[in-house]
Amino acid sequence: LALLGVTVASAPLCSRLLGRNAGWVLALPLIIATVMAVSVYDGVHTESTSWIPSLGVDFNIRLDGLSFVFLLLVLVIGAGVLMYSTRYLHHKDSAFYFFITGFAAAMALLVTTDNLFVFYVAWEMTTLCSFFLIGNSGEKGHQPAIRTLLVTVLGGLLLLTATIIMSVSTGTMQLSEVIASDYWADNPGTLTVVAILVAGAAFTKSAQFPFQAWLPDSMVAIAPVSAYLHAAAMVKAGIYLILRYSPLFGEVAIWNILLIVCGLFTAAFGAMTAVTRDDLKELLAYSTMSQLGLLVATVGIGTDAALTAAIVHTIAHACFKAALFMSVSYTHLRAHE
């Protein structure tokens, strides 16, 4: 994470010195971080340091199987997108490299932190980076960026409310301890409320009904942004959230109902809308929405087999959809030559 922080800080300078070729240099730390993650992973790897002692906020890092999978997606696909950008961009763009590396760092923090407050901060950082990356696409991106921000900020408020309730109720800010707390067995009403809030937060991030409109709207962004944020990383933050809390909410009926019903509706709506589109990028946006709906519904089933299938399909979808977005962009460029 420190390496990624240095990468973000150095992105503007690298961009000024190297222009669009800065992507080669900025991709290197992500590759190194991937190697480091693989080398330290031993099933469950934890690190902790005090951050805000007066509030009981520690900087806890927990690398378990779920975190490891999502961290590799963030780092590997992020490195690929940065290298792709060196040939896609036609001019020096310091803002792009700063915010895309900032997004990578925020996502890496989100999937590895074991602290509720830090998780929320990382969640909002991805929202802000997405807003600036979409808005950086020119005048046509300003309104979609604002609409995307409004929807995802709503999800952030839902997550913040859930975070406060969980930390106050259990007396801890450590995510793994919150999930394992005995408090929930004696307070099913509070558990149900938190489950609804967390599901709502995930729906805004992963473009699920009734918050699905922002995803196709945001496709005005350039191809590297669509490939990374809206196919491989940002929309997967919501999937990570529901997978992470699945052990806690798996027996809550409203949780399963929300995920299955909204997920299947989104999957059907996205698929039916996709086949009516003749713009390739728009088609991919709706098909992404459909696939995310299937993932959400699968997590809602809640069995071990279903959760395993959801994780496997998350990996497959992130890889092939990122590649498709970059391929479609190349097709558009050649078609307009």
What is the meaning of each model-derived region?
Residues 8-98, 169-186, 213, 244:
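Transmembrane helix-loop-helix hairpins at membrane boundaries of multipass inner-membrane proteins
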Residues 80-97, 101-119, 128-334:
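Hydrophobic transmembrane alpha-helices and their helix-loop junctions in integral membrane proteins
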Residues 1-3:
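C-terminal regulatory domains involved in ligand/effector binding and gene-expression control
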Residues 124:
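Short phosphate-coordinating micro-motif centered on Lys-Gly-acidic
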